[in-house]
Amino acid sequence: MHDSDKYFMKCAIFLAKISEMIGEVPVGAVLVFNNTIIGKGLNSSILNHDPTAHAEIKALRNGAKFLKNYRLLHTTLYVTLEPCIMCYGAIIHSRISRLVFGAKYKNLQKYICCKNHFFINKNFRKISITQEVLESECSNLLSSFFKRKRKIATKYFNNNII
């Protein structure tokens, strides 16, 4: 873990909290180049009616616009939740150097077919991965969000509103 990992993860957590305020799953991401944030993203799939509007994808898109290049060499992506398969694909193709995430994505194990999350050619460039940075803060944000959602759903279901 690098000295700056906690700082940049806290920036991603801030974005995740904004995502939650707009009714989205609280996930935030920042893309960093030379210790500077060049891309930010928060989940907005529901708001934008876009299944690809994940925090990671948005941070990568913003970073690519900033660098004027889709190849995001020598960058680090910080994200509050381990990326899904779609986001892993975008991360691999963007050629970032490093991925840092907070909470583990427990459902990902259902979909991975190869060791170490790499389901592509072994000769492809590898990405350094640092896991569970500020894990409890990231996990708590997600669990409290889903507890509230379940409580609301149960209330409506039990009162025959749905």
UniProtKB/Swiss-Prot annotation:
One of its GO terms (molecular function) is zinc ion binding. The gene is tadA. It catalyses: adenosine(34) in tRNA + H2O + H(+) = inosine(34) in tRNA + NH4(+). Binds 1 zinc ion per subunit. Keywords: Hydrolase, Metal-binding, tRNA processing, Zinc. HAMAP family: tRNA_aden_deaminase (MF_00972). This is tRNA-specific adenosine deaminase. It comes from the Bacteria. Homodimer. Zn(2+) binds at residues 54, 84, 87.
